[in-house]
């Protein structure tokens, strides 16, 4: 029987999730994968709120190493030792769950955003950018569909509410609630990664698009590397406890697993304002199953739990690579 409830500790890594509720003023057509639309609106509003030079190209800006927009949205421009080879943005979108793709006036819908490390200190700026983006209007097949951000919550903490506007976005960042950790699960025999959004796994320079190109072991290696990279880049003063002191120790655990996958090809179409065209993002979706003895699976559980929030693969800022754990 699937375990729907796990024992959760109060201790957490420096990662926080925010749930945003929107009330539409104009009809809005949500594309099947709305991450590109949401990310574009967010980036435009964040730049408007942050930029003081109004230069068209951030790479030429003398302040780009201090700019909050650059740190949040154009992280690859920040010159640090951790960015010498690769970089990741300190946020991931959590896409709307609505089955209907047309949101009518006065209807509400919701989505989320996860912030990592130092970006949590900028939560008020980030939520203000979302407020401005939604009020300005999301791209609706060439038109603007305006709305109102009526509520933002961080777990059980309400940060913004139209019912209490004077108290909105004034919570100190240290009071923002971080994600919980997870305790070991007794008699655990199987873990399933159920993907809520497509994932794009790059291996040997190519994106796996067909099931026969996919290796579940490489997915776990990718997740391990992503967690290490996010920890070092965005939260370097903390040690995210994932039960592994080094990569060799992690690989040794993988050899004890029985790995199965039930995945299929999928294509996500995104808009590129810079290139002024549609771009196809090929990837996979489905389930990945891990079976082993309880001790082995519990060694992996903290890492897999953390991956639910960080996502996996490429284009995580668009909300891709999000999965949900199913424990048995």
Regions found by a protein language model. Give the residues of each.
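RNA-interacting cores
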Residues: 1-328
């Amino acid at each position: 029987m699937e375990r729907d409830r796990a024992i959760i500790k109060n201790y957490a890594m420096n990662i926080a999730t925010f749930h945003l509720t929107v009330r539409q003023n104009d009809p809005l057509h949500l594309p099947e994968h709305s991450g590109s639309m949401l990310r574009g609106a967010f980036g435009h509003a964040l730049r408007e709120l942050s930029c003081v030079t109004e230069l068209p190209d951030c790479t030429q800006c003398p302040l780009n190493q201090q700019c909050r927009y650059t740190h949040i949205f154009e992280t690859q421009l920040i010159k640090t030792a951790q960015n010498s080879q690769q970089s990741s943005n300190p946020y991931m979108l959590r896409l709307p769950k609505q089955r209907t793709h047309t949101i009518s006036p006065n209807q509400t819908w919701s989505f989320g955003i996860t912030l990592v490390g130092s970006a949590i200190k900028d939560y008020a700026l980030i939520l203000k950018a979302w407020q401005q983006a939604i009020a300005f209007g999301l791209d609706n097949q060439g038109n603007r569909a305006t709305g109102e951000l009526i509520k933002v919550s961080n777990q059980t903490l309400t940060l913004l509410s139209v019912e209490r506007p004077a108290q909105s976005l004034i919570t100190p960042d240290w009071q923002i609630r971080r994600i919980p950790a997870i305790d070991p699960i007794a008699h655990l025999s199987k873990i399933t990664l159920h993907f809520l959004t497509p994932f794009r796994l790059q291996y040997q320079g190519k994106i796996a698009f067909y099931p026969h190109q996919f290796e579940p072991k490489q997915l776990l290696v990718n997740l391990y590397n992503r967690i290490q990279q996010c920890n070092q880049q965005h939260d370097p003063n903390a040690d995210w406890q994932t039960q592994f002191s080094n990569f060799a120790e992690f690989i040794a655990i993988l050899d004890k697993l029985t790995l199965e996958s039930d995945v299929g090809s999928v294509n996500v179409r995104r808009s590129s304002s810079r290139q002024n065209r549609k771009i196809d993002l090929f990837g996979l979706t489905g389930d990945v199953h891990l079976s082993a003895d309880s001790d082995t699976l519990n060694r992996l559980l903290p890492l897999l739990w953390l991956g639910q929030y960080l996502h996996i693969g490429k284009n995580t800022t668009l909300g891709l690579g999000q999965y949900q754990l199913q424990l048995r």
